[in-house]
Amino acid sequence: MSETAKRVALVGDASFYVGPSLARELARREHNLVLGDPAEGLVDELTALGVEVEAVLGVRNLADPESAQKLVAAARTRFGRIDSAAAFSGRVVTGKFLDSTLEDLHSVVQGCLEAPYHFLKAVVPVMVEQGDGQVLVMTSATAARPSRGASLYSSARAGATMMVKNVAAEVARNGVQVNAVGTNFMDFPEFLRASGANDPEIRARIEAAVPLGRLGTVEEFASFCMPFIDGTSKFTTGQFIAYAGGWA
């Protein structure tokens, strides 16, 4: 185990979506890091900032129960503790409820509900044992309101959000905070592809539906997440916050 006074943060997937940006923000705040499948060049970039990084490969699929367990084991072996942990997972299934299939349901539940379940089951017991810790689960703003054309996805995300609230209530007395933040209308490839927003006309219509009139960036989203995982604010738990430009 490394002898260090730095906090230790675990990012479940550092190759995708907000993962690399979260890792950068945490490194700037002098956190040592445990990263699942970090993006190419990211480890060198972060170690240049003076932090230690433990990369864990082959764990991107958090719906696999072993993925989160491997991340936690790596953190405990290298650093002896986990002060904060963040994870994003999901499988987007679109279409009307009446047109959906059981296969669609199983897919979205596995990606959006089982994955955060496995992550929480792996991370939270360590923090309970420590008597301290912060967990942030990324769900979706569609968990907060009905979403036309994404009923199964919205429903599964709502389930994950309520799971976070229940876990938070269960472990609050152990000094552990568990919160959820849900995005929508984000300027990153998966959303652009799923929504058709690579087409400028479609993007303009989508942006018009956002009260702030634009798409969000992963960099600003990572900054928003920091108080939930950087140890500076520990009086919030069991909350869901939509990060969607005022849409939810």
What are the roles of these predicted feature ranges?
Residues L136-G159, V164-K165, A169-A172, F185:
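Catalytic loop of short-chain dehydrogenase/reductase
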Residues K96-V109, I202, I206:
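Substrate-binding pocket helix/loop in short-chain dehydrogenase/reductase
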Residues P125, A169-E170, K234:
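Alpha-helical segment proximal to the catalytic Tyr-Lys
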Residues S2-V34:
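Canonical Rossmann dinucleotide-binding motif of NAD(H)/NADP(H)-dependent dehydrogenases/reductases
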Residues A172, Q177, T236-G238:
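Short, small/polar-rich loop/turn modules that mediate ligand/substrate recognition or access, typified
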Residues M226, S233, T237-A248:
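Short C-terminal tail/terminal secondary-structure segment
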Residues R173, F185-A209:
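A glycine/serine/threonine-rich, flexible loop-to-helix segment
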